[in-house]
Swiss-Prot record:
It is found in: Cytoplasm. This is Small ribosomal subunit protein uS15. Belongs to the universal ribosomal protein uS15 family. Component of the small ribosomal subunit. The ribosome is a large ribonucleoprotein complex responsible for the synthesis of proteins in the cell. Signal peptide: none annotated. The keyword Transcription does not apply. PANTHER family: RIBOSOMAL PROTEIN S15P/S13E (PTHR11885), SMALL RIBOSOMAL SUBUNIT PROTEIN US15 (PTHR11885:SF6). GO terms for biological process: translation. It comes from the Eukaryota. It holds the Pfam family Ribosomal_S13_N.
């Protein structure tokens, strides 16, 4: 996928395996994988962190092939999904970090410019999630309350 605020075209991407069946050497069942997902979500991990742990520690390459559903959909069915979508959360976290940096370094013009770019991405993503009804229609990003969102 191409970059929004950079010249790179971003042509490289990871390739999914052609076979969509569960490997024969995997001994975990669908229920075992779901229990692991619930346990990791209760620890406060994000869906992508859960996927990395399942891949690296338990040998589950794709949760969707084993369970039939994606991690976020499994979490939503149990009511464990995060309030904010993960990509929006990380953008807000980045904006808070840049703003904190700007408090210490007032003359950093490049950081000020990057903050504008990050916040414009936040507004664009928030508009998308409002149309998809993931966020409430009255949800609004404000820099003053952003640190409370990611704390």
């Amino acid at each position: 996928m191409g970059r929004m605020h950079a010249p790179g075209k971003g042509l490289s991407q990871s390739a999914l395996p052609f076979r969509r069946s569960v490997p024969t050497w995997l001994k975990l069942t669908s229920d075992d994988v779901k229990e692991q997902i619930f346990k990791l979500a209760k620890k406060g991990l994000t869906p992508s962190q859960i996927g990395v742990i399942l891949r690296d520690s338990h040998g589950v390459a794709q949760v969707r092939f084993v369970t039939g559903n994606k991690i976020l959909r499994i979490l939503k069915s149990k009511g464990l999904a995060p309030d904010l979508p993960e990509d929006l959360y990380h953008l807000i976290k980045k904006a808070v970090a840049v703003r904190k940096h700007l408090e210490r370094n007032r003359k950093d013009k490049d950081a000020k410019f990057r903050l504008i770019l990050v916040e414009s991405r936040i507004h664009r993503l928030a508009r998308y999630y409002k149309t998809k009804r993931v966020l409430a229609p009255n949800w609004k990003y404000e820099s003053s309350t952003a640190s409370a969102l990611v704390a």
